[in-house]
Structure formats: C-alpha cells, structure tokens
C-alpha cells in the first residue's frame, strides 16, 4: 500500500509512521471564533485557508494520540480527561461549563430529515430535540449526541455498506492494487439492497479480489476483503489520497445522504464524503482537513463501536492563546461532530476504536437489513455480527464555493 495513502485512513496499532519534517507555510494562529451560528454564511471566511496539506502535527497532540492508543479499555471509562457528552447530566458544574449549550436541532427537523432519507417512511419512535454542545476553549467544536435515531443508523449503514460500496464509481483503498469483481447494478433505486458484497459467500475460492501484481500480493476472499482489508470509501467528489486534493470530475454524491445531511445542517451542501471503517485495533493519525476550497462547516457522523476523538490547538512552544491544549471526546453510534470556524481547520485524530461497544440494534448487521427478502436475510445471517466489530465514520463536507 502506498505510504501517502496509509497516512490518512485507519491504520493498525501500533506502528510508528515516519513523515518528513517540513516547516509550516505560515504559523497556525488561533483567532477566537464568533458566537455559535448555524446560518448559511456562518462558516464563510474571507480569503483562503492556505494550510499546508503536508505539515507535521505538533508533538504534544501526537503524544496524546499515542497515550490514548495504549490506554487499557477499562481505563478509558475512568479517565477524567475524556468527555462523554451522552453523560453530560452527570458532569460537575465545572465540566458543564466547559461544554456549553450552543443551540438545538428541533425534533420536527430531525423527523423530517430522517423521513426524507427513508423515502417518506416516518420514524417508528418520534425524535427528541437534539442539544448542540460547544467546547468553551475550542470555539466551533460542537457535538450532538445521538442525533441519528437507531433505525436511521441501520438504514445509514445499509446504504453505505450495501449500495455505495458496491458502486465502482466510489473509490476504495484496494482499487489501485486489486481487480475487484463488483456486484451487478441494483435493479431498484428504492430501499432495496439487491446488489451487495454481503450477498456473496464469505470464503469462495472462485469469488476473490485478484491482485494486479500477483507476485507481490495474494488474492483476497470476501471475508478478508470486508473484515480486514477494507479501510475507506470515498463518496461524491473523489479525494485523492497521494496528492491530498480533489479530482475535477465529480462522482455524484448520494442523493439520499445529501438530503439527510442538508436536512439536519442546512448550511452544508455535501459534495464529498470520506467513509472510514475501523476495526478494534485501527486508528486515524493526527491530521487536518484542509484540502477543500470551500470554508463551510464539516459534519462527521459515527455508527457502530465507540471511538476516542481528539483535537488540538496551539503550538508546542506557544504561549497565551497559542499555548498547546487538547481535548478528548468519546463518540458513540449516532453522534455527530460538527466542525465550524477555527475548529474546522484544527489538528484532530481518531485515537482508537473501542471494541464490543456497538449498540445491540446495529451489532448484528447485515442481519436485519431493511427491505431484505427471506433469501437475502438467510445470506446476511452468514455475516451476522459484522457491525459488532466495526466503527464507521462518515465526514461530509462541501468542497467548492
């Protein structure tokens, strides 16, 4: 696998990545963001970001990244430096002051967005108002716990992992090295997933991904492909990992996913989505999302197992407002991290995925796929429990002004 590709998708733990040290094109300066505003122009800024896409992260955030990677699972539950916003009601007053209410997404808006995503099917359990919390010292870092209802999470996972993964127009990390026998095109554009890699046998010697350089790589059966080798999928505008830029010729962004994102966050017009698949020992290195030409906010959706998300501001030797500081957040299935203002361009990472934390309503997926026939469900049961081992993160962003 190419080194540059490996730097920006889930990696196996533990391995030290050596990257060339080069100075920033200009120092990263923290400027306090304005008050929370989810209007269309809230995240517009004059000029261009001009961040160096190959800059090296500060040492202090890399040390935090490795600290959480090596921490025992049991210690994650008691670490006082990790914020779990699903338990904010249990916070001390001091900790509550760190995460302040920054707005609400009304229940009616959530219901409407999820119903539109499900092609008009209403939620079986009406949504509740979703509180937005913003970090006091990281303006623009906002978390909405449990924004996606359980049934929407199941549909969300099905659309991504059945339909979108089976579409060769959406790139995956293995396309450069393997010839991939994609399933036939779906026969329906509704909520029927009759074209999927999960409708194949787990281990069939006649149904494999064949390497383009057979003297260097081995063939992969479907189980090896889906459980261990699949790391990322790109939707819409195709992000090029080696150059860290976007191609000029767009692949259409999934229309239903666009409807969901815009329904929840009207100020974002999603044009690209990076889907990352984490297993128990996978992590995302420290990086910044600075390749987009547009200055709009980014919405990052999580489904599956919990993860530890970290963010940093400041520099190793900075002082005052530029002093080094970091924050760690435990994100759950259904949570959304919304990055706007200066937080949109901050260093961040997914330090680890936490195994055996996927909620019961999703853990057995693809068993229980919406709209499946009896024959399809029989095949899905052979893959039962796939999502119980996975964490999927989908960051939806607008690329162009």
What are these regions (language model features)?
Residues 16:
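Cationic, low-complexity basic patches in intrinsically disordered or flexible, solvent-exposed regions
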Residues 8, 19-401:
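Non-heme Fe(II) oxygenase metal-center motifs and adjacent flexible, charged/small-residue loops
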């Amino acid at each position: 696998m190419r080194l540059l590709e490996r730097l920006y998708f889930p990696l196996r733990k533990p391995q030290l990545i050596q990257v060339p040290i080069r100075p920033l094109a200009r120092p990263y300066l923290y400027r306090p963001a304005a008050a929370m505003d989810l209007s269309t122009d809230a995240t517009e800024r004059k000029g261009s970001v001009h961040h160096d896409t190959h800059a090296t992260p500060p040492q202090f955030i890399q040390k935090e990244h490795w600290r959480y990677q090596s921490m025992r699972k049991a210690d994650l539950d008691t670490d006082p430096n990790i914020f779990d916003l699903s338990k904010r009601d249990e916070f001390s007053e001091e900790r509550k002051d760190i995460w302040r209410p920054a707005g609400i997404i009304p229940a009616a808006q959530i219901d409407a967005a999820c119903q539109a995503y499900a092609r008009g099917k209403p939620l079986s359990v009406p949504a509740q108002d979703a509180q937005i919390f913003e970090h006091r010292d990281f303006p623009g870092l906002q978390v909405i716990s449990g924004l996606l209802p359980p049934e929407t999470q199941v549909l969300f996972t099905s659309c991504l992992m059945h339909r979108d993964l089976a579409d060769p127009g959406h790139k995956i990390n293995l396309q450069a090295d393997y010839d991939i026998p994609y399933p036939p095109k779906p026969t329906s554009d509704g909520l029927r997933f009759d074209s999927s890699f999960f409708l194949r046998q787990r281990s069939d010697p006649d149904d494999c991904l064949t390497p383009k350089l057979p003297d260097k790589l081995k063939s992969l059966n479907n189980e090896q492909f889906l459980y261990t080798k699949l790391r990322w999928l790109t939707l819409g505008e195709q992000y090029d990992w080696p150059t860290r830029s976007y191609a000029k010729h767009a692949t259409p962004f999934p229309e239903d996913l666009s409807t969901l994102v815009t329904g929840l966050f009207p100020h974002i017009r999603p044009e690209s989505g990076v889907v990352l698949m984490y297993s128990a020992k996978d992590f995302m290195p420290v990086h910044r999302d600075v390749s987009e030409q547009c200055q709009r906010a980014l919405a990052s959706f999580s489904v599956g197992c919990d993860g530890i998300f970290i963010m940093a501001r400041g520099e190793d030797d900075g002082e005052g407002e530029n002093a080094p500081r970091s924050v760690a957040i435990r994100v759950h299935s259904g949570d959304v991290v919304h990055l706007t203002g200066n937080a949109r361009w901050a260093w961040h990472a997914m330090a680890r995925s936490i195994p055996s934390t996927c909620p019961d309503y999703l853990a057995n997926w693809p068993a229980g796929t919406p709209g499946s026939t009896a024959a399809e469900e029989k095949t899905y049961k052979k893959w039962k429990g796939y999502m119980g081992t996975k964490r999927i993160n989908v960051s939806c962003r607008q690329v162009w002004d």
